[in-house]
């Protein structure tokens, strides 16, 4: 986007020798001038939207937090995308390599695209690492070395972790010299979910060993044994695991189940874990813990065959690069008659905690809920951060209806449908479901009550571009 007046103002600042010699010192010593420039740029790039007072305060708090990181609580609807964009731009102008982590791939792509024009006005390079093409993703890490400004990369936490492992352990030189002579800074969306709820989550780079293919016969026999077992309560499962383990070992010793001798120790070590996974797979349901469908990227199918796609129960997003370990993936493939994959071995790994701690005092985050005092104390000790609770930009005008409870599933669905039909006469209705299964059940119940299908926008999977649909037609006339 070209804006002669803005470009003149921008060039007057950033062509200065003081900025070229030390961008960070110059920006921090001229904060009022830089913030004025950022707000002006955002207003040009996003007419008629301008930052609100609370959003400016959020930016100022991030800037003033020098010796520690900062996690801010800001309510839903207060414009986190704008705050993330302003903060990323400020630290990129300081010369930092800025990484922005979202809770899923779709939000990362959307966040970068919404801020791209704003970044371009400030002559900042931005990109995301959410493409199916690794070469395109890796290009996002390569800044223009002729400028002192840093560049900005959006992505989900797993994508950054994978690239770190590939770069540092497999020597793929993904980052080039991006982090070599620059400070690095991490800005996190939904920080409580990733830093607290998922602090123990670990990303592995796995390796498939061809010889483990010979375990297929064992997996089939394990699955058959688990299906034959009667389980009346969860307390019985431990004893069932012991019994099946003993039975399988005897069959392996007697050559009734073939296992190569060089795999004996490995099988002995993993057998009980596999049996436990088989019991888990037996009770796991499609459209709850996972979906059975064709993976999508940017709304396009990336495979021809339906496969098991892990669903994150916290966010409802599909985890295309995630596979369950300890045989669980294989037992679900047997359950749903998919092609049986080979059990993989974990080679190198990194936890969420370790990843976030790499950024030291340059760790910044936003969330709708910071949690209890105990949670905040835990985060402060773990990541060396402090906290801020920001007020809303205006007084909220809403009230809560009395809660209703149903004892039967059919009554629960009926109540939701009747209440929705009543409320939609005067306002739009949003129904947030626990899983895909509930989405389908409520959809069918609304249809049963006579709601026309074309008046219901159903968001069932990643890649369903519901936001674009509502931009074109925000509500339905009744």
Give the ranges of each region predicted by the language model.
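Conserved P-loop NTPase motor core
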Residues: 1-478
